[in-house]
Each structure stands twice: as C-alpha cells, then as structure tokens.
Amino acid sequence: MLGIWTLLPLVLTSVVRLLSKCVNAQVTDISSKGFELRKIVTTIETQNLEGLHHEGQFCRNPCPPGERKARDCTVNEDEPDCVPCQEGEEYTDKGHFSSKCRRCRLCDEGHGLEVEINCTRTQNTKCRCKPNFFCNSAVCEHCDPCTKCKHGIIEECTLTSNTKCKEEDSRSDLLWLCLLLLLLLIPPIVYVVIKEPCRKRRKENQGPHESTTLNPETAINLSDVDLSKYITTIAGAMTLSQVKDFVRKNGVSEAKIDEIKNDNVQDTAEQKVQLLRNWYQLHGKKDACDTLIKGLKTADLCTLAEKIHAVILKDITSDTENSNFGNEVQNLV
C-alpha cells in the first residue's frame, strides 16, 4: 500500500510532462501554420504589385491603356477580357484591372479655358487659356483675364503671365498740353496761310504810279465806276461755276439762273455775260465794283479779284490823264 502512494507522484509528474509536450507541439504547429499563411498573403500582395488582381479568380495581366476589363477572370492567372474606352469621352493612360475608364476632362470656357489637345482613349484632354487670358499656377483649373493698360504696355500678356502696364506720369499731361496748344495755334496759322498770299498779290499789283498819282476824287469814282463796259472782260476772266456762285450769293434767283442757262445752252460764254449783266442790273451802279471785288476775295479768288481791280483802275487812270491833257490843251488855246 505504501508503494502505491510512493509511485503516484511519479505517475502524475509523467502525465504533466506528456501534456506539456502535446501543448507545445500544438502551439508550434499553429505558429508554423500562421507563418505559412503570412507567407501566402505576402506572395499574393507581391503578385498583385506585379500585375495580378483578385476578384473571384486571379488575372495575370492588366488591361492595356485605352481599354477596360469587361468581365472577371474565370480561371486563375487567365488573360482578362478587355474592351476599348469610349473615344472622346473616356480614357485610361496606363495598364489597370478596373472595369471602368476615366472620364475625359472638360475645358470650361466660363473659366477662360479652351481645348489644346482633344481627349483620346489613351490620353486625357489638355486645356489651355483662351486668348487674352493667363494662368500662372502649375495646374490650371481656371484662367484670369489679362489686364488692359491705360497708359501703355511694358510686356504683353502671355499664357503664363499677366500684362505689365506703364504707370501714369507727368509726360502724359505734357503731351495733352502740347496737343491743346497746337489746336489753339492751328486757326491763326491757317488764316495767315490763306490770307497772306492775297495781301502780297495786292501789294504786287499796286504799282507806284497807282499808289501815288491817284487823288481822292479818283478813289471816290472807283466805287461808282460803271461796270457795264467791263462785264465782258470780267466774264472772260471767270469760270461759269465762279460766276454762278457769285451771282447766287448776291441776289440772283435760281429761277433766273436756270432761265439764262436754258436760253444759252450751247454758249457758256454768253451765260456768264448774261448772269453778270443781270446781277449788275439788280445791284445798280453804286458800289457795284466794291461788291464784285469783295465777293471774289471772300470766295478765295484773290488773284482774280486783283486782276479785275487792276484792269478797272488802269482804265480809270488812263481816262483821268486824258481828261487832264485835254483841259491843258484848251487852256493853251
């Protein structure tokens, strides 16, 4: 009986040791299986990075750029069934396992963009700024309008930079001042250019004899000279349009002008004579010569006015000298 109690601790110790070995063996087996599982997962992940994708079954290769997967692979490491993306609306620019293509980018005109390169199955749309717009960022989602310069441009606006404008300075004020002075000086300059030739020609046509020998009585008679004997000479020195313009401005009616024209359709010389005679009859003898000379000068016909004035003045001077000579002869008798 004593021997049994002595052997019992030994038996229990052996059982405990045996159980411990079994547990250790199971733990070791579980650890080994966990390691193998991790190895498998790592292998799968590595294969995924190399182009395998698992959706039901493994596909060995991705769909090429411009295509998408139409269905999953039915056999491990099978080739995928790929179909093209929709041209102009979708694209893929690299190999992939997706069943969808990417949507093409839209170039929003409202944001200052326009299409530079159209979208294809393998390339997205490329946008750029519209004319008179710019974008200075790396990725342009919108473009800004170019600045309009009021005082001049230093650098023109480009696709990537805004316009550089000149600043307003005192030179612009000086320019406006010079322009204003020029506008003020133009009228007197034009007046001198137009009127000075008339004044010079008047001095040239007035000889020394005319300026010194005429007495006050001759000057008075010039304003009351009878133009009837000079009408033909005056008409010959003027064009028909000049005669019409003069008589029209000095009281001859359009009806009378047309009547004289119709009466002398084929003879323009006679038209001029009759028009001047009609004007002279309406005006009368008094101051008719002055009216004629002033009217021609007003119409910028200075040369013609001086020529007619010289002819009449010379004729009056000659008549005066002849009259004086006749009086001297009578006194001698």
Swiss-Prot record:
Gene3D superfamilies tied to this protein: Death Domain, Fas (1.10.533.10), Tumor Necrosis Factor Receptor, subunit A, domain 2 (2.10.50.10)
Transmembrane segments: 174-194
Cytoplasmic side: 195-333
UniProt entry tagged with the keyword Transmembrane: yes
Alphabetized GO MF terms: calmodulin binding; tumor necrosis factor receptor activity
Post-translational modification: Palmitoylated. Palmitoylation by ZDHHC7 prevents the lysosomal degradation of FAS regulating its expression at the plasma membrane.
UniProt xrefs under SMART domains: DEATH, TNFR
Record-linked CDD domains: Death_FAS_TNFRSF6, TNFRSF6
GO biological process: activation-induced cell death of T cells; immune response; motor neuron apoptotic process; necroptotic signaling pathway; negative regulation of apoptotic process; regulation of stress-activated MAPK cascade
Residues modified as Phosphothreonine: 213, 320
GO CC field: CD95 death-inducing signaling complex; external side of plasma membrane; membrane raft
Death domain segment(s): 228-312
Lipid attachment locations (S-palmitoyl cysteine): 198
Signal peptide boundaries: 1-25
Intervals holding TNFR-Cys repeats: 47-83, 84-127, 128-166
Primary localization: membrane
PANTHER family, per database record: TUMOR NECROSIS FACTOR RECEPTOR SUPERFAMILY MEMBER 6 (PTHR46874:SF1)
Subunit and partners: Component of the death-induced signaling complex (DISC) composed of cell surface receptor FAS/CD95, adapter protein FADD and the CASP8 protease; recruitment of CASP8 to the complex is required for processing of CASP8 into the p18 and p10 subunits. Interacts directly (via DED domain) with NOL3 (via CARD domain); inhibits death-inducing signaling complex (DISC) assembly by inhibiting the increase in FAS-FADD binding induced by FAS activation. Binds DAXX. Interacts with HIPK3. Part of a complex containing HIPK3 and FADD. Binds RIPK1 and FAIM2. Interacts with BABAM2 and FEM1B.
Biological role: Receptor for TNFSF6/FASLG. The adapter molecule FADD recruits caspase CASP8 to the activated receptor. The resulting death-inducing signaling complex (DISC) performs CASP8 proteolytic activation which initiates the subsequent cascade of caspases (aspartate-specific cysteine proteases) mediating apoptosis. FAS-mediated apoptosis may have a role in the induction of peripheral tolerance, in the antigen-stimulated suicide of mature T-cells, or both.
Name the record gives this protein: Tumor necrosis factor receptor superfamily member 6
Organism annotation: Macaca mulatta
